[in-house]
Amino acid sequence: MASGNLNSADNPLPCHYHRYPTRSAWAKRLLSIASLCLLIGFLASCGLITDGQASNTGSLKTVAQGSHGQFTYVAIGASDTFGIGTEDPYSENWPTDLAGMLGSNVHLINLGIPGMLVHEALSIELPIALDSHPDLVTIWLAVNDLVAKVPVDRYSHDLDLMLSRLQASDPHVPILVANVPDLTLLPYFKTYDPLVLQSRVQAYNAAIAGIVQQHHVILVDLTRQNYNIEAHPEYISGDGLHPTDLGYMQIAKVFYTTLQHAQEPAKKP
């Protein structure tokens, strides 16, 4: 990892990068999560939820299209998962777009919380994800850790722990983990040392790729090839950091395409 300051002296980099969502959006999201927790607790106490129900060994595409009942998709993340950058983060975010692509009977549980770090998500978001017995999990948690200067080895440890707990609960659930886009292309970072920032992005992405390979989960590549911010400035909102609704739609497409390719049977030589 490169040494030096990640940010310029005149523009200190905040530990948690985000604009706060509207009060109504927060209220809706928190009410939904609270209601979900109460429902899960009630069903578990009645013996209506068991570990066996979490298994998902069939085709993801078939299940999502509705042949096996409701399909639960859990999105773990931060402000980018929440939907910051749009007029209505509660409904305009990439997990909602992805859920729509997967099928009409998909039940989305969006756990994205602005400012979230992976270490914090282990105790805040992960327990809800586990109790939900998901059929699909996406994880996009890296940029907050990167800008907060969390050491790569500490970040790797926490991400590894998150995946281990998810797979211990259900070894068959598909899990997609996204990496870090090219932050040097974002207007928000224009005053920062691009070489240091790029080096840190590369270090994080190398760590993410290694952990994804170790756990045999699916890597979602959001680097320039798939999410070209430079060619599509309309993907970025007025804060110079978070995506617009168009940007979120493109991110959802990258997740969906990656998932579809991962589900395809391996070609015979």
Predicted regions span which residues?
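N-terminal secretory signal peptides that target proteins for export/translocation
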Residues: 1-27
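Sec-dependent signal peptide hydrophobic core
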Residues: 30-38
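C-terminal motif of bacterial Sec signal peptides marking the signal peptidase cleavage site
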Residues: 44-45
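Short, conserved catalytic or interaction motifs in soluble domains
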Residues: 48
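Serine-esterase "nucleophile elbow" of acetyl-processing enzymes
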Residues: 51-114, 126-131
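Gly/Ser/Thr-rich beta-alpha loop segments that engage phosphate groups in nucleotides
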Residues: 79, 85-87, 114-117, 144, ...
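Alpha-helical cap/lid subdomain in secreted, periplasmic
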Residues: 100, 123-267
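Subtilisin-like peptidase catalytic core
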Residues: 109-113, 117-122, 142
